[in-house]
Amino acid sequence: MIDPDGFRPNVGIILTNDAGQVLWARRINQDAWQFPQGGINPEETPEDALYRELNEEVGLEREDVEILACTRGWLRYRLPQRLVRTHSQPLCIGQKQKWFLLRLISNEQRVRMDLTGKPEFDGWRWVSYWYPLGQVVTFKREVYRRALKELAPRLLARD
């Protein structure tokens, strides 16, 4: 599902632990790290997609997490031209994302990245809240900055 402007609806997941660190996941067979994220299917709400992606990508269920906050609007990024599939219709030029800030309320041993036939990640670690800004691929950096900045007060408010 791609909107009329060429952006694919998507959810981004910032999963925190009790120390305020965030789960940082390594893309399979790559030295590239990112937050879990994934597309919203036509029949899904962003929250439905959040729970589906959370399970597919990190093996967690609804009862393993608490939603602390969600971005108010959609945050967009454009794909670099080399990643745009110019022969696909409709043409997708980027993603528009709703970002969710979650707190892990179960044991971190429940995190599993091998539950699907095609896992997206092969490793993970806890990092400081702002660490991803200096590490994520350049074209996603501004969306990460905006999401982290908007959601940070909600993380701090629970302390």
Swiss-Prot record:
HAMAP family: Nudix_RppH
EC number annotated for this UniProt entry: 3.6.1.-
Residue ranges annotated as motif Nudix box: 38-59
Function: Accelerates the degradation of transcripts by removing pyrophosphate from the 5'-end of triphosphorylated RNA, leading to a more labile monophosphorylated state that can stimulate subsequent ribonuclease cleavage.
Sorted UniProt keywords: Hydrolase
Domain (Nudix hydrolase): residue spans on this chain: 6-149
GO molecular function, one term: mRNA 5'-diphosphatase activity
Stored PANTHER family: M7GPPPN-MRNA HYDROLASE
Pfam families: NUDIX (PF00293)
Cofactors: a divalent metal cation
Catalytic class of the enzyme: hydrolase
InterPro entries reported for this sequence: Nudix_hydrolase, NUDIX_hydrolase-like_dom_sf, NUDIX_hydrolase_CS, NUDIX_hydrolase_dom, RppH
Family assignment from sequence similarity: Belongs to the Nudix hydrolase family. RppH subfamily.
GO CC term (a single one): cytoplasm
One GO BP annotation of this record: mRNA catabolic process
CDD domains registered for this protein in UniProt: NUDIX_Ap4A_hydrolase_plant_like
Keyword Hydrolase: yes
Species this chain originates from: Pseudomonas fluorescens (strain Pf0-1)
Taxonomic lineage from the root: Bacteria, Pseudomonadati, Pseudomonadota, Gammaproteobacteria, Pseudomonadales
Protein name: RNA pyrophosphohydrolase
Annotated gene: rppH
